[in-house]
């Protein structure tokens, strides 16, 4: 590590180099499936805009993937500012694309102009063939660099247009170089469902199989297939749609009163949102509001019973498709929608449609209401049972714990908050129904070398154990009180130290919680940036620089505030940045069987008292990677 830090030490990454250096920031590096999805999304965007009727996908025997569409064809003319063919610009330059405005596509899944260029950056070779204006063009790239100029290789009919992208993923960037065929087929089938009338084919040359999908009544047919043979309520799915100038929503849903595997899929501009988001929240809220209104109007709600979202949502199977301009996603992989206005839009549309349906189908509606009321009554009985058990047999909960009222492990969350002042703000900012808060005083004990029999001697550890309902070193999670246990510490070095000690506690003494995916670390922002009435939050210096760069195009001077700790945030800011599921950032603490030994070795080196020499050597070797507050 060099001792001098001057202008020579500053690196500027250009072209596709940022992607090749940090591929995990741009795609899922488990398998190359996400690269395939990016190319498929481009072709489907053409279908969504009404310019394509067919998309063909071929998985070749050498694990390369080819996607062919009959859309307009990528532009091949020279870009007026950059002086290179547009197709070359699209593949070689991050943030170059035709989907930033609404001139070319009303709705699209491409937002940042990085999708196809990421495919190019992480592939050994990419070949693009464009049919446009009666000519066939070809261009090729290797390792993100152009190796063959755009050239005309043939002619075709004027109406014969489209694009073919054939790419060979670079296995050095992925845990496994092989495509998951089942996931690929699931994505393609979903695209066909969401684009009624568009034909999508998949040819698998590895397993010698072919598949074709084309749905005329997309969502209804798809949901009906998924629950075929199971008793449903109603018999035929409740379907609806609404199309506005800048937003559109389609849905199909039904309930499985006797249980069964639920299909729960959501999409934004045909992009699958595996983790849901604001559109799914809006669907749930709209159904709840309509059902509450129906029950109150018909006076069928027993005294003391109030329906909650989980009562109407518990056995609901649904497919939801939202189309909107400028959607905001949590992360580049677009697995969760965070656009706040979408929740209100979907909720309002669904509430009106479901209210109408309930009053037009009274018999089925009353059966649904009975099912929801029975769920609410079970929930109330379970809550009373839990309270009675606490008073008679179990240890009293810690006094500083501000508990929640819900019991559903799919929703309940416990936040372990650094400091009393931040704990007070968090108690005001939380949703009392499903979020519990427990403040911690200072740094907890380093428990890495403490036996599980002795660890409860620490009052803080004892309180955490009682609050979550699990004994140290126990694999029995039947008494677990919260589905998510979230570590919430300051974004500075002290906060990171506390978060590390808490992670060590869970990895060493509550390993079953970690292995079952119950432990999370919240990522509070370090900066708040204000420009007029617009507010932005940044987690790191790099994010702050990115936001400021983006704001240069707007009038006014941005005001930057650095949070010294969680205690500096008011309850509204704390809710928006760290507690609200729609806008916060959580990182799940996970340990796979393969990583077990490696995780133990790393934690032991960092936390064991006898390993000080190893720590010093590690710091000398890796110290230049540290992000320090100086």
Curated annotation (Swiss-Prot):
- Check the record and name the SMART domains matching this protein: HATPase_c (SM00387), TOP2c (SM00433)
Instruction: State its Enzyme Commission number(s).
Output: 5.6.2.2
Q: How is the cofactor bound?
A: Binds two Mg(2+) per subunit. The magnesium ions form salt bridges with both the protein and the DNA. Can also accept other divalent metal cations, such as Mn(2+) or Ca(2+).
Name the reaction it catalyses.
Answer: ATP-dependent breakage, passage and rejoining of double-stranded DNA
What processes does the entry annotate via GO biological process terms?
chromosome segregation; DNA topological change
Which cofactor does this sequence's record say it needs? Mg(2+); Mn(2+); Ca(2+)
Annotated site residue numbers, Interaction with DNA: 443, 446, 497, 615
What are the entry keywords?
ATP-binding, DNA-binding, Isomerase, Magnesium, Metal-binding, Nucleotide-binding, Topoisomerase
Per the record's keyword annotation, is Magnesium included, yes or no? yes
Q: What does the entry list as the binding residues for ATP?
A: 5, 42, 69, 110-116, 334
Under the heading CDD domains, the entry gives: HATPase_GyrB-like, TopoII_Trans_DNA_gyrase
What's one GO MF term for it?
DNA topoisomerase type II (double strand cut, ATP-hydrolyzing) activity
Q: Which InterPro entries does the record associate with it?
A: DNA_gyrase_B_C (IPR002288), HATPase_C_sf (IPR036890), Ribosomal_Su5_D2-typ_SF (IPR020568), Ribsml_uS5_D2-typ_fold_subgr (IPR014721), Topo_IIA (IPR001241), Topo_IIA-like_dom_sf (IPR013760), Topo_IIA_B_C (IPR013759), Topo_IIA_bsu_dom2 (IPR013506)
Q: Where, by residue number, does Mg(2+) 2 bind? A: 490, 492
- Annotated positions binding Mg(2+) 1: 418, 490
Per its UniProt entry, which superkingdom is the organism in?
A: Bacteria
Describe the location of the Toprim domain by residue ranges: 412-525
A Gene Ontology cellular component where this protein is annotated is:
chromosome
User: Subunit details for this protein?
Assistant: Heterotetramer composed of ParC and ParE.
Q: Which family does it belong to?
A: Belongs to the type II topoisomerase family. ParE type 1 subfamily.
Query: What HAMAP family is this protein classified in?
Result: ParE_type1 (MF_00938)
Q: What does this protein do?
A: Topoisomerase IV is essential for chromosome segregation. It relaxes supercoiled DNA. Performs the decatenation events required during the replication of a circular DNA molecule.
Name this protein carries in UniProt: DNA topoisomerase 4 subunit B
The species this protein was found in: Salmonella typhimurium (strain LT2 / SGSC1412 / ATCC 700720)
Q: Which gene encodes it?
A: parE
């Amino acid at each position: 590590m060099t001792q001098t830090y001057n202008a020579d030490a500053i690196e500027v990454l250009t072209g596709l180099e940022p992607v090749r250096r940090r591929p995990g920031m741009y795609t899922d590096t488990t398998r190359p499936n996400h690269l395939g999805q990016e190319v498929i999304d481009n072709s489907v965007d053409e279908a969504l805009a009404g310019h394509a009727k067919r998309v063909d996908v071929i998985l070749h025997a050498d694990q390369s993937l080819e996607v062919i569409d009959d859309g307009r064809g990528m532009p091949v003319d020279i870009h007026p500012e950059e002086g290179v063919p547009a197709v070359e610009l699209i593949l070689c330059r991050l943030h170059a694309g035709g989907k930033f405005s609404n001139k070319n596509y009303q709705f699209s899944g491409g937002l940042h102009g990085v999708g196809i260029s990421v495919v190019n950056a992480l592939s050994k070779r990419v070949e693009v063939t464009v049919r446009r204006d009666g000519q066939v063009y070809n261009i090729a790239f290797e390792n993100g660099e152009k190796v063959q100029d755009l050239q005309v290789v043939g002619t075709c009919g004027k109406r014969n247009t489209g694009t073919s992208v054939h790419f060979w993923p670079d296995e050095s960037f992925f845990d496994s170089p092989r495509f998951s065929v089942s996931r690929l087929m699931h994505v393609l089938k979903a695209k066909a469902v969401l684009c009624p009338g568009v034909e999508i084919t998949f040819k698998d040359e590895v397993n010698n199989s072919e598949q074709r999908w084309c749905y005329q009544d997309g969502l209804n047919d798809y949901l009906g297939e998924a629950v075929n043979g199971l008793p449903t309520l109603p018999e035929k799915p409740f379907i609806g749609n609404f199309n506005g100038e800048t937003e559109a929503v389609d849905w199909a849903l039904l309930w499985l009163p006797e249980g069964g595997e639920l299909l729960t899929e959501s999409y934004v501009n045909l992009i699958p949102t595996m983790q849901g988001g604001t559109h799914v929240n809006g669907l749930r809220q709209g159904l709840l509001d309509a059902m509450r209104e129906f029950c109150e109007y018909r006076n069928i709600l027993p005294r003391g019973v109030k329906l909650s979202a989980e009562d109407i949502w518990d056995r609901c199977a649904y497919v939801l498709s939202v189309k909107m301009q400028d959607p905001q996603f949590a992360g580049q992989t677009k697995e969760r929608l965070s656009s706040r206005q979408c929740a209100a839009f979907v909720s309002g549309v669904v509430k009106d449609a479901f209210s109408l349906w309930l009053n037009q189908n009274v018999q089925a509606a009353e059966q649904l209401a009975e099912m929801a009321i029975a769920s609410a009554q079970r929930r109330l009985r379970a809550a009373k049972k839990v309270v009675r058990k606490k008073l008679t047999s179990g240890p009293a909960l810690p006094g500083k714990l501000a508990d929640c009222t819900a019991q559903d492990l799919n929703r309940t969350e416990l936040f372990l908050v650094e400091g009393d002042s931040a704990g007070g703000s968090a108690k005001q900012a939380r949703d009392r129904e499903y979020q519990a808060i427990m403040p911690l005083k200072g740094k907890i004990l380093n428990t890495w070398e403490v036996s599980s029999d002795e660890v409860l001697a620490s009052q803080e550890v004892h309180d955490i154990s009682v609050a979550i309902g699990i004994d140290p070193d126990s694999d029995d999670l039947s008494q677990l009180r919260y589905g998510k246990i979230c570590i919430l510490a300051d974004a500075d070095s002290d906060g990171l130290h506390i978060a590390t000690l808490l992670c060590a506690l869970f990895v060493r003494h509550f390993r079953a919680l970690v292995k079952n995916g119950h432990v999370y670390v919240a990522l509070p922002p370090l900066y708040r940036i204000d420009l007029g009435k617009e507010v932005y939050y940044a987690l790191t210096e790099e994010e702050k620089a990115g936001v400021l760069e983006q704001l240069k195009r707007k009038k006014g001077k941005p005001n930057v505030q650095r949070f010294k700790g969680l205690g500096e945030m008011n309850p509204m800011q704390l809710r928006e940045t760290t507690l609200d599921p729609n806008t916060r950032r959580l990182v799940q603490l996970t340990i796979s069987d393969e990583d077990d030994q490696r995780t133990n070795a790393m934690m032991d080196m960092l936390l064991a008292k006898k390993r000080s020499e190893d720590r010093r050597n590690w710091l000398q070797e890796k110290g230049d990677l540290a992000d320090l507050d100086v």
